[in-house]
């Protein structure tokens, strides 16, 4: 693993990723109830096997950020598995602070992004056979096996990460959990922040995290 922790005034950060195995449910158990007798679920996917499949979520911190040509390096167990390149599409050229970006294999792209109208979410599909308009059309893993993400700008300079299990927390993300930031997103969030942890009660694909309630107000002003 490349032990680089770029975090001071990070322009974009990792907010959440799905570590739930394809044959498991969030919080364990079955379709009717989690292992504790509750109903752990995702606010978008509901309670489904795999909790939506391979996906992760970023938050834009720097206002008017240009992500054209940036690179998302994905590691499992300390080994670089895949690099997903963002394209030069104009969508990436002027992102507002507080924007949520999800990258997933299964859900088709939804780039209907309009912060002025209250739509702060961009979803792009990275999968073999996807259209490749916004991101490299290549499948990628997300798992509970020391999964980490590193973000590089168009020049190849590391601007954040790697972040994930094995950095913070050091271990303990289970195959029935998500990894999430349990703090308000800001430029002070480091890749090794102690506010990164696992959760099995709820996940929030494309929305602010809930363990308490993540507040985007300081970014979306």
Regions found by a protein language model. Name each.
Residues 6-146, 152-198:
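Activation on beta-sandwich/Ig-like modules and their edge loops
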Residues 1-6, 198-221:
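A recurrent domain-boundary module in secreted/ectodomain proteins
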